[in-house]
């Protein structure tokens, strides 16, 4: 590919993203249709063979939905059981009691930081969002006041803190120490989550006016109040089961011999889909039968909670299709090649590569994996003394500027019932704050070591 053609690819991609935003935000066109049309148009303009365009888009949608559809469905069922049984109400009461109503946003960032450790962002989100809705209602604040701190905690853990799967990929690539990375990540992650979560929420929420009618909120809150609520312990155990199982799966090769039957069993139950499935089945007993619901009621709950997730699932899949087009058209390769032209320190290179890949692909995990794979050989060759900081810098870059090609962007938009413009002002800025603050703290830490 000639340099001029490569630069034009970047121009085409930028125009496509701008067109996407304008058509959805300004002209109020259906987001799924717009993403599909823009993705196919970009592929054709970028020179992809017409016969391969639809296949590439379908592959991107299918790959994304193959995981996300199951996660959203199972997580929504688990959330519905928490809501109907009063488990979410019990957790909300306990959190408010311990932290106080004025500090509910601090409670949400703390629980997200803990629950999100072994979970991909989407899994943690669907697990915790019923609690966020319930806390917001009880305290009488906008869902954004507790929801933004929640997603800040989840995102910080996703980007920085092992044993989260995304962070572990970078730890392996850079040959970093898990223990030291964990220590540095906590030191950097806590202030980052505070700034991007509770503090930013206090600033932006008064400036965002949400519609009063939120169909997704209704399915968690519009129910008859129950006299008897499940205990906090059993509710917490149910929601933490997938967390524990995924932690076990993440450490399977360290606590068992790779390849043997026990190791395979641990990897199986530690898979996010299996872990959520087991937790959902457990909730049918702990939050269903044990609370006086019969099988017909549980069937009704699980059926009615899925309909509102259809649009979310489609939008997340469409974002995956756009992601695949950007990769197959050569846009991501061009970004990597362009960044190679600048001779930067490994720390800056790790952040910059990850940031560019994040903007291009929409996936924090893909950005972290790709960037660490590119930068690690350079850093190792230069003998960079602190590979743990490279993990953190790469993780910080991987969450910058979430926009329309990121499934998480649409997940946040739909669940919190925001417009595209409001999602940029809240979620996109929050993610960018996490990236910049975490990177600044990482650079600062590098001068102290």
Residue ranges and their predicted role:
Residues 7-11, 62-68, 95-109, 138-146, ...:
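Membrane-interfacial loop-to-helix junctions in multi-pass transporters
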Residues 33-36, 40, 56-89, 268-330:
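Core transmembrane alpha-helical segments of multi-pass membrane transporters/permeases
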């Amino acid at each position: 590919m000639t340099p001029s053609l490569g630069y034009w690819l970047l121009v085409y991609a930028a125009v496509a993203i701008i067109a996407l935003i304008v058509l959805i935000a300004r002209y109020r066109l259906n987001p799924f249709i717009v993403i599909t049309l823009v993705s196919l148009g970009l592929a054709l303009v970028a020179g992809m063979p017409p016969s391969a365009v639809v296949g590439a888009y379908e592959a991107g949608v299918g790959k994304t939905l193959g995981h996300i559809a199951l996660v959203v469905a199972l997580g929504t069922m688990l959330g519905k059981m928490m809501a109907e049984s009063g488990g979410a109400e019990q957790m909300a009461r306990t959190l408010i009691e311990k932290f106080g109503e004025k500090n509910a946003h601090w409670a949400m960032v703390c629980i997200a930081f803990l629950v999100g450790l072994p979970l991909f962002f989407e899994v943690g989100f669907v697990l915790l969002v019923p609690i966020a809705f319930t806390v917001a209602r009880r305290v009488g604040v906008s869902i954004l006041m507790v929801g933004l701190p929640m997603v800040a905690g989840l995102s910080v853990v996703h980007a920085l803190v092992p044993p989260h799967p995304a962070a572990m990929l970078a730890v392996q690539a850079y040959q970093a120490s898990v223990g030291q990375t964990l220590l540095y990540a906590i030191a950097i992650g806590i202030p980052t989550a505070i700034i991007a979560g509770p503090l930013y929420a206090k600033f932006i929420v008064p400036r965002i006016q949400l519609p009063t009618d939120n169909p997704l909120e209704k399915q968690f809150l519009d129910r008859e109040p129950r006299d008897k609520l499940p205990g906090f312990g059993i509710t917490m155990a149910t929601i933490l089961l997938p967390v524990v199982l995924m932690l076990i799966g993440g450490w399977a090769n360290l606590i068992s011999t790779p390849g043997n039957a026990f190791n395979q069993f641990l990897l199986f139950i530690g898979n996010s889909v299996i872990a959520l499935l087991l937790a959902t089945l457990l909730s049918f007993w702990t939050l269903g039968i044990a609370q006086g619901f019969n099988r017909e009621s549980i069937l009704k709950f699980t059926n009615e909670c899925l309909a509102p997730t259809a649009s979310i699932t489609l939008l997340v899949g469409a974002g995956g299709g756009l992601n695949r087009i950007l990769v197959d058209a050569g846009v991501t390769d061009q970004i990597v090649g362009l960044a190679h032209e600048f001779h930067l320190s490994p720390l800056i290179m790790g952040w910059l590569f990850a940031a560019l890949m994040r903007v291009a692909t929409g996936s924090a995990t893909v950005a972290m994996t790709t960037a660490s794979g590119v930068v690690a050989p350079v850093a190792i060759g230069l003998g960079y003394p602190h590979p743990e900081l490279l993990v953190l810098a790469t993780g910080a870059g991987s969450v910058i500027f979430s926009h329309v090609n990121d499934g998480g962007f649409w997940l946040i938009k739909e669940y919190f019932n925001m417009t595209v413009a409001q999602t940029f002002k809240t979620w996109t800025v929050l993610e960018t704050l996490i990236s910049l603050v975490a990177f600044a703290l990482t650079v600062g830490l590098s001068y102290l070591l």
